[in-house]
Amino acid sequence: MKILAISDTPSKALWDYCSRERLAGVDLILSCGDLPKKYLEYLTNFTAAPILYVHGNHDGSYRTEGEPGGCICVDDQVYVWKGLRIMGLGGSIRYNREETFQYTEREMRRRMRRLWFKAHRAGGIDLLLTHSPAAGLNDGDDRAHKGFACFNDLLEEYQPKWFVHGHVHLSYNANLPRVCTHGQTTVINATERYTFEIPDPDPVARKRFFWNDPAFPTKN
């Protein structure tokens, strides 16, 4: 399965020179947020691959202009596509008074808890799709680009194979990796665009998901 991950900055190669040939072979497009509505809608003209997205902290215009047409919002969902189980949690850490798609740690933990039963019913998750990174895992030094500590708990409890995020542009720090590993999880920074391939999901080989409510206490 070939996946194109995009985030934060429209790719010139896609925005100015997109074609069906350029997106040939792409099975799924994942957007980590902070992309113009018209950019996502534009890409739908060149591919039959579904475009799944979560919101970024700069996507407030979606609330006034409407969500991107032809795309699927997976924010606060466990979305299963061809056996691939995707948990979506958009938004950034709250760093100013803007109300749109910014969350405190407590608020994000509550969102995570609300997804627990959906994840259990799906038998777990394979891919975590977010806008922000996890705290201490290739996040930024400034308040606006700090990651969520609760995402570390989620990675430990759910152990997804892939964690795809944006928010922290690679241009911010030359030492930021595009791809790294954290335990059993491959972590991908999707800023602008990144293409990767994964094995086709095998539902038969899935491990049984835990029944216990994961230890995600509501805390600051």
Residue map of PLM features:
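N-terminal active-site segment of His-dependent metallophosphoesterases
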Residues: M1-F46, W116-G124, N220
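A generic local structural motif
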Residues: L14-R20, K37-E41, I72-V74, R113-F117, ...
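Active-site neighborhood of phospho(di)ester-bond hydrolases with catalytic His/Asp-centered motifs
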Residues: A5-S7, L28-D34, L52-N57, V74, ...
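Conserved beta-strand segments of alpha/beta enzyme cores
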Residues: K2, P50-L52, I72, R85, ...
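Conserved catalytic scaffold of divalent metal-dependent phosphoesterases
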Residues: A5-L14, H58-K146, E192, D213-F216
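Active-site environment of divalent metal-dependent phosphoester hydrolases
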Residues: P10-L14, L35-E41, N57-T64, R94-E98, ...
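A short, gly/pro- and small-residue-rich
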Residues: T47-H58, F148-F151
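Binuclear metal-dependent phosphoesterase catalytic core
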Residues: I6, E65, V78-K82, L154-Y158, ...
